[in-house]
Amino acid sequence: MSENAEAPKQPVFALQRIYLKDLSFESPNSPAVFQSEWKPQVNMDLNTENKKVSDNQWEVVLTLTITAKLADKTAFVIEVQQAGVFMIDGLSPQQLAQTLGAFCPNILFPYARETIDMLAVKGSFPALMLQPVNFDAIYAEAVKRQQAQQAAPAEEAKH
């Protein structure tokens, strides 16, 4: 073997920074909402986005929107964009997609959850502890949906 033969590239993953990118708290029906018994309907919407910052740096943004309602009145709406910059190199395209779509959001979620809890309390509402999210399952479902959508036009072309 030649000494000049290139060794296989080792995968690199490093968290470089976690930060709060955007934050919003609204309590449109306060103070009247404080007079009602606290039995809210809580809805959580989440989304992830990523973009390449440099050759081996990626920004991943986890957006959580929490809406708490009492009957038909909105008690509060909290939106948090928790972001991170990750150094990622040496992964296959499939590994990179899963890392950006599942692994990085798993790292960011506890920070977003803590911020949401703190904002609810600062807004004079009871603490709101969000349940863990299985980003691996969400990612796997998104991949499955994408594959089904790609297969559908191929099936139509056959008929």
UniProtKB/Swiss-Prot annotation:
Any one GO molecular function term: unfolded protein binding
GO biological process: protein folding; protein tetramerization; protein transport
Subcellular location: Cytoplasm
Pfam family name, one: SecB
GO cellular component, one term: cytoplasm
NCBIfam families: PRK05751.1-4, secB
Record-linked InterPro entries: SecB, SecB-like_sf
Assembly information from the UniProt record: Homotetramer, a dimer of dimers. One homotetramer interacts with 1 SecA dimer.
Gene3D superfamilies according to UniProt: SecB-like
PANTHER family: PROTEIN-EXPORT PROTEIN SECB, PTHR36918
Similarity remark: Belongs to the SecB family.
Keywords linked to the UniProt accession: Chaperone, Cytoplasm, Protein transport, Translocation, Transport
Function (record text): One of the proteins required for the normal export of preproteins out of the cell cytoplasm. It is a molecular chaperone that binds to a subset of precursor proteins, maintaining them in a translocation-competent state. It also specifically binds to its receptor SecA.
Taxonomic superkingdom: Bacteria
Principal subcellular localisation of the protein: cytoplasm
UniProt-recorded name of the protein: Protein-export protein SecB
